[in-house]
């Protein structure tokens, strides 16, 4: 699989307690087919952070990668915005 075709997501870091791993919450907005109401779906991904740079509240871009552990299939590409 080429890097160009890998999925990317933008989310915020909700946990950085693990070594070289962060939990990123990604929010999707979907329209309910019957109610026509916008609903927020939040999914959490474990992402690889090689240098332990991410902190809670940072806005990051993650990219799909090969399985790195039992639950880790994403890696942090860039920190888009630092938490205040």
From Swiss-Prot:
Family statement: Belongs to the universal ribosomal protein uS17 family.
NCBIfam families linked: PRK05610.1, uS17_bact
PANTHER family listed in its UniProt record: 40S RIBOSOMAL PROTEIN S11 FAMILY MEMBER, SMALL RIBOSOMAL SUBUNIT PROTEIN US17M
Protein name in UniProt: Small ribosomal subunit protein uS17
SUPFAM superfamilies according to UniProt: Nucleic acid-binding proteins (SSF50249)
One Pfam family here: Ribosomal_S17
GO CC field: cytosolic small ribosomal subunit
Gene Ontology annotations of biological process type: translation
Source domain of life: Bacteria
Protein species of origin: Moorella thermoacetica (strain ATCC 39073 / JCM 9320)
UniProt keyword annotation of Cell inner membrane present: no
Function: One of the primary rRNA binding proteins, it binds specifically to the 5'-end of 16S ribosomal RNA.
Keyword 4Fe-4S included in the entry's annotation: no
Gene Ontology MF annotations: rRNA binding; structural constituent of ribosome
InterPro entries, A to Z: NA-bd_OB-fold, Ribosomal_uS17, Ribosomal_uS17_bact/chlr, Ribosomal_uS17_CS
Subunit comment: Part of the 30S ribosomal subunit.
Keywords of this entry: Ribonucleoprotein, Ribosomal protein, RNA-binding, rRNA-binding
């Amino acid at each position: 699989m080429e890097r160009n075709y890998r999925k990317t997501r933008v989310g915020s870091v909700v946990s950085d307690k693990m070594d070289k791993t962060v939990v990123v919450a990604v929010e999707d907005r979907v329209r309910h087919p019957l109610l026509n109401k916008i609903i927020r779906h939040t999914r959490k991904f474990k992402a690889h952070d090689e240098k332990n740079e991410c902190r809670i509240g940072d806005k990051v871009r993650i990219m799909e990668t090969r399985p790195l552990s039992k639950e880790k299939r994403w890696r942090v590409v860039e920190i888009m915005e630092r938490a205040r």
